[in-house]
């Protein structure tokens, strides 16, 4: 996983321009020698701590990851997580500024009173590759006679050891007797190469060219496309017809071209991108100024535009629409503090997180983001398996407009672009609460150089309402609060920002939330209002959300790969359908509520649209709770949100996108575990001609009876735009759940029984 962040994005201003009467205590001594003093504000901000001044109490509050510190100027003692700590040198004031000794950070934040971070004594076998391991893998690959100088790196990641060995390590402390290996994917021009490197023995194990596949779009492709556009006379002439004389003000967005069986006139074996463009008018929001009906097709190998596709000229919307607040007055909001005065309730040991009864491993992947692994729940002293590995499997954002600049738009954000690579650093106090621990993560860039992403993942505990409550008449109230541990990650893919939360509940439930925010992809039109002559045609495929701007209808479809091991690897898929049946037992009632229960025995039958009136369980037929019920987890692909996709993809069955990406149309898939089956859209979905993902994985229709199975959960929203989402979109959430079902013997949050005296 990552290291705690050394930088804080929260811009906390010290309120020190007040009538403080503390005099500069010079010289200041520590251990008999003169102390070297440094400015508190600058020093602690660079360290990544929040600094707050309470004018009424005349004290500072300092917050950094698991440490919560209170200290008064001139005091010889600080309070760290509720415990007193003697200071070698007090905080002193001079000219209304606070100064601390250069040993202050070490004295306070390394005092041992913050127990959030623990030293990892046994490296977890699923730890992501370190920067040194990435460098080692690249050196070994580059030493191959087959390596060419212009080869770029798509992914460099851990090739995990066998699942059985990892579980034995996690539960029984058995060492993994397998060398660390790196899985390396490269692009030699348009050709994909896969390599495996043995890091322990420092050797190349395999080198495999991949045929009939296109690789990811890499970050340097964006710069290449912009350069090609800037130097194209043909493109300059095309934008000039639209009243744009300075082509360098045109911002390009390179997009994958999809697959249409040659009907788009594009060569299948060429490495192509379609480029749509926007005009930078200086308002900080070029997305509001689309250059409509103009598409440039760029060949990345030839480094040139091979085709320009044009439709009727539509004037570029020119009204400024900044979203950064430059033209607004921010509302006055009183501060809200989240404090943990005695420290965190969780610990982070290397890449393992322990909170209440949960233990799990956390790492970062350049394609799908956070990987949650070896998830166990401590049930009265027994560690029980819940999930071997969970992550975003993949996602797609398909648009429903058939026009020239829109018909090909179906963004496979993780599979085509790499959402881990596009991680957005988390802003403390805005993107995550101020009490969050922010973790840096390291991945490889396209040159194979390790790249640290600051504040890549946030971990925090939060209040989540009552866990349970009952008020018996005449008796004391019985209730307890619900706490949740959240692992948050954000990826920015072009105009949209996606927030993913993995939420652990004390009662054994795991929630997975996906939030979409950012800027809508909009279409330039002639209509200013719905009363204009062209309004009906202009809004056939979307909503008029501003003058001359339509938000086009589309979907955000997420799929999560969940290798659940419910109290063990061998599980079965069980259906429970509540039904109304006649009352045959007598009495005044004519009907009863009953449940039809049956097993779903194979992969093709398991692929289903989600009916919220039914129950689907992954059950362990070999384990029972004390009442004799099989222990299970309920799979809930949609547990609330906006515009659910429960009825599937909004495409006709004869569409190529429908055939290439089956995962879109059904919300529940279950397949037999195979370690190489990792992505619902397939390993290389860019311009794929057929389904190489879940449609292929389930084609052999393997049995799901009492076997190691993987759950693939599809959810999302059908996004019909509205004015309230423009020019920037409030976060729209969709929620999913994995809920224990007879997994426990009783309410799991009651606590342990008191021991007899």
Curated annotation (Swiss-Prot):
Catalytic activity entry: a primary methyl amine + O2 + H2O = an aldehyde + H2O2 + NH4(+); 2-phenylethylamine + O2 + H2O = 2-phenylacetaldehyde + H2O2 + NH4(+)
Location of 2',4',5'-topaquinone modifications: 496
Signal peptide: 1-30
Residues binding Ca(2+) 1, per UniProt: 563-565, 708-709
EC numbers: 1.4.3.21
One function term, GO molecular function aspect: calcium ion binding
UniProt region (Disordered), positions on chain: 680-701
Catalytic residue positions: 413, 496
Keyword Manganese set for record: yes
Superkingdom of origin: Bacteria
Binding site for Cu cation: 554, 556, 719
Activity regulation, per record: Inhibited by 2-hydrazinopyridine.
Family recorded in the similarity comment: Belongs to the copper/topaquinone oxidase family.
Designated name of the protein: Primary amine oxidase
UniProt lineage: Bacteria, Pseudomonadati, Pseudomonadota, Gammaproteobacteria, Enterobacterales
């Amino acid at each position: 996983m990552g290291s705690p962040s050394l930088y804080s994005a929260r811009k906390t201003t010290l309120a020190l321009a007040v009538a403080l009467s503390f005099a500069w205590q010079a010289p200041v001594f520590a251990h008999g020698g003169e102390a070297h003093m440094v400015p508190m504000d600058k020093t602690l901000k660079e360290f990544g701590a929040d600094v707050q001044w309470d004018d009424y109490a005349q004290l500072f509050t300092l917050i950094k990851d698991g440490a919560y510190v209170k200290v008064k100027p001139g005091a010889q003692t600080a309070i760290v997580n509720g415990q007193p700590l003697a200071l070698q040198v007090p905080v002193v004031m001079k000219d209304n500024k606070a100064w601390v000794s250069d040993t202050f950070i070490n004295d306070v934040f390394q005092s041992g009173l913050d127990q959030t971070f623990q030293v990892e004594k046994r490296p977890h076998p699923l730890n992501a590759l370190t920067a040194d391991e990435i460098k080692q893998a690249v050196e070994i690959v580059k030493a191959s006679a087959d390596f060419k100088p212009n080869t770029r790196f798509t992914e460099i990641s851990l090739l995990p050891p066998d699942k059985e060995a990892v579980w034995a390590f996690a539960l029984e402390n058995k060492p993994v007797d397998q060398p660390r290996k790196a899985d390396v994917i490269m692009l030699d021009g348009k050709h994909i190469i896969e390599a495996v490197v043995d890091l322990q023995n420092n050797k190349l194990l395999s080198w495999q060219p991949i045929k009939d596949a296109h690789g990811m779009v890499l970050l340097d492709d964006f710069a290449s496309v912009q350069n090609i556009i800037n130097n194209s006379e043909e493109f300059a002439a095309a934008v000039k017809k639209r009243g744009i004389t300075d082509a360098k003000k045109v911002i390009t967005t390179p997009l994958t071209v999809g697959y249409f069986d040659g009907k788009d006139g594009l060569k299948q074996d060429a490495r192509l991108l379609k480029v749509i463009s926007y005009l930078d008018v200086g308002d900080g929001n070029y997305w509001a100024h689309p250059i409509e009906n103009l598409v440039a097709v760029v060949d990345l190998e030839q480094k040139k535009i091979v085709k320009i596709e044009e439709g009727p000229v539509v004037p570029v919307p020119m009204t400024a629409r900044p979203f950064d607040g430059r033209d607004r007055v921010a509302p006055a909001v009183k501060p809200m503090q989240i404090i943990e005065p005695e420290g965190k309730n969780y610990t982070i040991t290397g890449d393992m997180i322990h909170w209440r009864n949960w233990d799990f491993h956390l790492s970062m992947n350049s394609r799908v983001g956070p990987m949650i692994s070896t998830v166990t729940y401590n049930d009265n002293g027994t560690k029980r398996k819940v999930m071997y590995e969970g992550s975003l499997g993949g996602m797609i954002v398909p648009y429903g407009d058939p026009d020239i600049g829109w018909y090909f738009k179906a963004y496979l954000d993780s599979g085509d672009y790499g959402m881990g690579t596009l991680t957005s650093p988390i802003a403390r106090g805005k993107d995550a609460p101020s009490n969050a621990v922010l973790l840096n993560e390291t991945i490889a860039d396209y040159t194979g150089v390790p790249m640290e992403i600051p504040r890549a993942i946030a971990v925090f505990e939060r209040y989540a309402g009552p866990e349970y409550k009952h008020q018996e008449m005449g008796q004391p109230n019985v209730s307890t609060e619900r706490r949740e541990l959240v692992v948050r990650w954000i990826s920015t893919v072009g105009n949209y920002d996606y927030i993913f939360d993995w939420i652990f509940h004390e009662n054994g439930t795991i929630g997975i939330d996906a939030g979409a925010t950012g800027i809508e992809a909009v279409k330039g039109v002639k209509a200013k209002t719905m009363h204009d002559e062209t309004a009906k045609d202009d809004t056939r495929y979307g909503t008029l959300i501003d003058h001359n701007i339509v938000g086009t209808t589309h979907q955000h479809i997420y799929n999560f790969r969940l290798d659940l091991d419910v109290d063990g690897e061998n599980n079965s898929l069980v259906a429970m359908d509540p039904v109304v049946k006649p009352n045959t037992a007598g009495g005044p009632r004519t009907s009863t509520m009953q449940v039809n229960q049956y097993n779903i025995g194979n992969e093709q039958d398991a692929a289903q649209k989600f009916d919220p009136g039914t129950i689907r369980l992954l059950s362990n037929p070999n384990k029972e709770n004390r009442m004799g019920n099989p222990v299970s987890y309920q799979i809930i692909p949609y547990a609330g949100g906006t515009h659910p996709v429960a009825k599937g993809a909004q495409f006709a069955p004869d569409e190529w996108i429908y055939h290439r990406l089956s995962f879109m149309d059904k919300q529940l898939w279950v397949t037999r575990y195979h370690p190489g089956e990792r992505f619902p859209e397939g390993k290389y979905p860019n311009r794929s001609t057929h389904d190489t993902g879940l449609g292929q994985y389930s084609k052999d229709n393997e049995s799901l009876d009492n076997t190691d199975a993987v759950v693939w959960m599809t959810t999302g929203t059908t996004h019909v735009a509205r004015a309230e989402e423009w020019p920037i979109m409030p976060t729209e959430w969709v929620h999913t759940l994995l809920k224990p079902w007879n997994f426990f013997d009783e309410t799991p949050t009651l606590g342990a029984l008191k021991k007899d005296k």
